[in-house]
Amino acid sequence: MRARELARQGGVAERIAFERATAKEFSGTYDLVAFFDCLHDMGDPIGVAAHVKSALKLDGTWMVVEPFAGDRIADNLNPIGRIFYSASTQICVPASSAQEVGLALGAQAGETRLREIIMSGGFSRVRRAAATPFNLVLEARP
């Protein structure tokens, strides 16, 4: 794998590892798990949330970065929201629908729905850590 070779060349191979696994099958215990623009593409985001929770240390954090969206369609009728809706219709929803469960959140799920997904996976606390016109960053704790 090229990543391993680059790590070796960079002198960090003994400190890092590269694994390939699905979001519901990765192994290990972590202080931090980070998802970037992907939870809405997953067919079973609740199952994924439950797996992430099981992989976190008791004081661990799950950082979820998702496309920014309001909770109501009317909140997203702006140039960025329209682009996100069109991309989501063509890419995100079909990808999720083709997977196990097929929840099809789409890129415009909105903060309330994302919180519901995360809490349904067993997390007890979710807070908005940051937001821009393009991204929403949520911090979830077991």
Language model: regions and residue ranges:
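A short SAM/SAH-binding and catalytic strip from SAM-dependent methyltransferases
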Residues: 31-46
